[in-house]
Amino acid sequence: MDKRFIALPLHHKMYHQKSICMFLKNCIYLLCLGIASITTTVKAQPYVSPIGAQVFIEPGQTDEEINTWFKLLSEHQMNCCRIRMFENYMKHPDGTWDFSLFDKAFKAAERYNVKIVGTLFPAAPDNSLGGFKHPYSQAHLQEIAVYIKQVVTHFKTSPALYGWVLMNEPGTGGWVPNDAFANTQKSEWLKTLQPTAYNSKGYPQIVDFTPQQFLLHYNTWYLQWIANEVKKYDPNAYLHVNSHQIFSNIAEYNFPAWRNFLSSLGASAHPSWHYTMFHRNQYATALGANCAIIRSGAGELPFWVTELQGGNNTYSGYKAFCPTKEEITQWLWTSIGNGAEHILFWCLNPRAVGDEAGEWALVDFQNQPTDRLTAASEVAKTLRKINSSQFKPVVANIHILYTRETLWVEKKAQLNDNTNNDYEGRNTGGAMKSAFAMYETLLENGINSQFQCFDEFNWNKASYKGETIILSGQISLPSRYWEPLRNFVRNGGKLIMEGLSAFYDENMFALHHTGFPLQDILGGALKEVKCLPTDFSVNYQNALLPAHLWKGSIYNTQGQIVVQEGNSVLATRHRFMRGETFWFPSLLGLGALRSDKGEALSRLLLAEVEAAVPFQFETYQKGVQMYTMQKGNQYLTILINKRPQATTVSLRCPKGVNPSVVFADKGGSATASTAHLSSEETLVILWK
């Protein structure tokens, strides 16, 4: 502000009224001028749809085709896309760079107000499908650095650029690189390791998980390196990465460490590739669990479903199929209900050559919208209409926890054929399926729960009253978690433990006949485990509770007996300080999942957990799911009916809220206490 209008003539004994009026008038004038300048320079940010798709760019495409795809995105209110930035399509053999193909895509995106997330995709041998996961050599690393410099500096000023995906789908499926470059990195990493005080009571450690620990480090190191390279040329760049095969690769992801260099965390969610341990009718629930895992991994960062299957499998996919329009709708609302900021389909258009050629697309071979694209557009329109970004997921204080070491031990233990269905609990994937069963059972009560790595749980709270941890099938419980878990129960938390959870420590050292470290909080230790191939039932509160493979009995020292068969104690409850534990060392999760009868497990869980959520089903609803979101005193409930017939479900709702249907793809309806859905329908209700 001009000092002439502030410095009054203090040497005068008296101020003239006219001078004061002039001073005030000038102040008001300058204030108004400042406000006017602000309102003329600050522009409203353009709306970016939560829903978008991959536009696959490759040589041979015409300008008209490229323009058509971005026009289609805009017309369907899906103005966010992802492009794989192939180095092979930019760099000539003589070392010169030609970005003209991708410039056309960026110009088309600008023309139709579509934002682009560019996936960095440097050159490497055999690199057409998912991309390589680590550099092959120091020379390759330097080539990648040159590629990043070229691409980022060229495109960083484009108005269409939203951000960068650091690499496509990190994660090797547990395979540990053994090339010279990786071994050099491993040698450097080993020098940083500190000796641990815990040594499994001095027993010989004949199982070595150092390779798995290195892979966990190596994935993080490479992502951090890429992020640093991008930031050299674009310090304010938006950085993202998409995990994949979450129910197996989860053991090589250190999400809390990734938060240090990411702007958001994402997931690829292709049922035909990634959900093969589930039946098709469970794909929507599997996506919900996938979202819960990524939401937890992201922490305070946003999370995306970076790739979602959009079209048909011909030769690709482990369990090939073509999603229906109803499934597309279910998957979108499942992602939104879990809080996904963006959902991008793979793909809008099919690639023309190589792996997946002619597959996966939302458009047909004449570039016309399929019913899947139309369905996605209807969801996008609704999301904009209700301003969905203002609603946040309501998630119960129920934490289904997993350990990476469980997956390492499970894989190490595979000595024989692991495809025999009678032994599913000990096959690869058994642990995560058992944990998934807990998630599914709660969801079929309308309760959305947390699905988290032990490292992502907040172990530093003074009180855990009202919170529940579920350990289902987590066979390895590392020593570093024993005291935090004890503190959780001590300070008011509820621990539910089933199956052979805590059977081993991190070194595959059996804990129960060598002095069980959690005997104080559980009130006992395992007495024996009997292998009963296939399935069996246990009588629990005058009803049969399905279980699978392992029947554990408890050496009970302090617990209250809950289930007993003859002299065998099968389940106990124990008060420890301000908290409580409930222990049932048989595979209940897999028992419910395999039998397709979750009602008995549902009764057990609802009796043991505190689910302080505003909306629930009045009774267990097999095959029906509900997610709840909240904005102030308004709620969204998202219901999905996977039953083969129409259904009416009774709802437990807050007092004083009234329903209005904002989305129903098959004419569903709602009253103040019920919802009616056709088979395969998604129904979204606004309550206020």
Cite the ranges covered by each PLM segment.
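N-terminal carbohydrate-binding accessory modules
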Residues: 42-80, 389
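Polysaccharide-binding and catalytic clefts of secreted carbohydrate-active enzymes
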Residues: 135, 146-150, 154-289, 293
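A short, well-structured beta->alpha microelement
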Residues: 440-461
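A conserved amphipathic helix/loop scaffold
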Residues: 472-688
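Hydrophobic targeting/anchoring helices
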Residues: 240-243, 248-436, 528-530, 540, ...
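Aromatic-lined substrate-binding rim segments of carbohydrate-active enzymes
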Residues: 66-139, 143, 217-233
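Short, acidic/polar
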Residues: 60-73, 144-151, 247-258, 324-332, ...
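The substrate-binding groove and active-site-proximal loops of carbohydrate-active enzymes
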Residues: 51-61, 86-99, 129-143, 170, ...
